[in-house]
Regions:
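Short, charged/polar "capping" segments at the starts of alpha-helices
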Residues: 126, 179-183, 339-344, 367-373, ...
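Active-site beta-alpha connecting loops in nucleotide-dependent enzymes
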Residues: 199-200, 292, 310-384, 418
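A glycine-rich beta-strand to alpha-helix segment
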Residues: 390-418
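Phosphate-binding loop of NTP-binding sites
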Residues: 6-193, 201, 205-206
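Short active-site oxyanion
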Residues: 115-117, 168-172, 304-306, 355-362
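A conserved, hydrophobic alpha-helical segment in the catalytic core
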Residues: 133-142, 220-230, 256-287
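Gly/charged, well-structured mid-domain segments that form the phosphate/adenylate-handling core
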Residues: 271-311
């Protein structure tokens, strides 16, 4: 069972106060949807938590909760994991992507007869949500710079994870290829290490333990100053195979593109195994996932195929550039700087836009002029437009790759569906 805030009745084991809070939250969510103000999951959760601050803890009591957190890939991994765990029982998940306490509360309010709660968690809120939900497993995928005006610097965030998770009884499934994640998870009692890769390394050259300069020969990494080093992984991504702890390779056949999703699938298989789901079964179930909240979806705009891609930070843009069709495929870039995106756009200068040289590029969004300056410096030929329809009309033949950050992506989805 997937997660919609109204999808099922609350558990009969809830207190009268908790039941009232759930009912009021669902009513608020319904009003929000009727007013055209989105899914209502956030406002519904806020109302419910105002009435019962302990509601999240109550809703999680009868679930095997799995938390997924990362800078990039957490929504997709949550979707893949929910599908994999359905092999072992019903699942409730915050599929609408609201990953802070209010949205998570709304999702779990629709748990019905679910056995598993598969929950995506914003990095900043991980320790608090872990405290409230008593998870059986926690997946830590990666950490890199993102919304520094809202979130902490990456090492500070890793330190919050390390301190907040140090006493957890959960099994922690952590990416051994990310030094920040490894350092954060090293304080936990039960850790399964996964060699899931790390394409973007610009935030991982300073040792999180002592501040020394990291050495990264081949796939290994270590700090010569303090001895902090990559742990021996239990699971590994090798090519297009997941290698389990026994050394058995299992093929990954996703419909989702790119190496990042092979990495997500590897972590998912490791998490699913904690609950007795065989890697082959988990990977086969992941094959059914075609798109995630609009990501990777292809749509027709005025008769032209447009593929929708989300990129929110330097690491995400780097990964997305590996997915797009080769030049001269047309590319649309859209960037906003609303609160959900982070209002500081200086991160644009950390993205290697030189990779777009040779592509016809069309720039739109609230901060299109900021992006235009960055592309000018990168030597990329571009045209500023006001809408996706205008870009489509001017684009040369070929599939159009549309890359947008968070709120620009949501606006783009609305525009192509209208």
């Amino acid at each position: 069972m997937s997660a919609h805030p109204d999808s099922a009745a609350p558990s009969a084991s809830l207190t009268a106060r908790a039941k009232l809070a759930v009912t009021a939250g669902k009513a608020a969510a319904a009003v929000s949807r009727a007013a055209g103000r989105g899914s209502g999951s956030v406002i519904g959760g806020r109302v419910a938590l105002k009435l019962d601050p302990d509601l999240l803890r109550s809703l999680a009591e009868n679930l095997d909760v799995v938390l997924v957190s990362a800078t990039n890939g957490k929504t997709t991994t949550t979707r893949l994991l929910a599908e994999a765990l359905r092999a072992a029982g019903p699942v409730v998940s915050n599929a609408l992507g609201a990953n802070m306490p209010a949205g998570i509360t709304s999702a779990l309010a629709g748990s019905g007869d679910a056995r598993f709660g598969v929950i995506e968690v914003d990095e900043k809120y991980l320790a608090g949500v872990a405290r409230d939900t008593n998870p059986k497993a926690i997946a830590l995928l990666n950490l890199s710079r993102d919304q520094l005006d809202r979130s902490s610097e990456t090492r500070m965030l890793a330190e919050k994870w390390r301190e907040g998770l140090s006493g957890t009884e959960a099994v922690v499934i952590a990416n051994a290829d990310d030094p920040l994640v490894t350092w954060a998870a090293s304080s936990c009692r039960k850790v399964i290490w996964v060699a899931a890769g790390q394409a973007y390394r610009e935030d991982a050259w300073s040792c999180p333990a002592c501040g020394g300069v990291m050495q990264r020969p081949d796939e290994e990494w270590f700090c010569p100053s303090c001895g902090f080093r990559r742990p021996q992984p239990h699971w590994a991504l090798q090519g297009e195979f997941v290698v389990d702890p026994q050394g058995t390779p299992w093929p990954i056949r996703l419909q989702l593109p790119g190496r990042a999703n092979l990495s997500n699938a590897t972590s998912t298989a490791a998490v699913a195994s904690v609950f007795g789901v065989h890697p082959q079964t988990a990977l086969q179930r992941m094959e059914s996932v075609q798109a995630v909240a609009g990501r990777y979806e292809s749509v027709l705009v005025d008769g032209r195929e447009v593929r929708l891609l989300l990129a929110k930070n330097p690491a995400g843009w780097l990964e997305t550039f590996t997915l797009i069709d080769q030049a001269p495929a047309p590319v649309v870039l859209s960037v906003n700087a609303l609160s959900a995106d982070g209002t500081d756009t200086s991160w644009l200068w950390d993205v290697d836009y030189e990779r777009l040289v040779g592509h016809p590029v069309f720039v739109m969004g609230q901060r299109k002029l900021d992006l235009a300056v960055r592309l000018e410096v990168a030597g990329v030929q571009f045209q500023v437009v006001d809408s996706i329809q205008q870009a489509v009309a001017a684009a040369p033949p070929g599939r159009i790759e549309a890359i947008a950050n968070y709120t620009a992506f949501q606006q783009l989805r609305r525009d192509v569906q209208s």
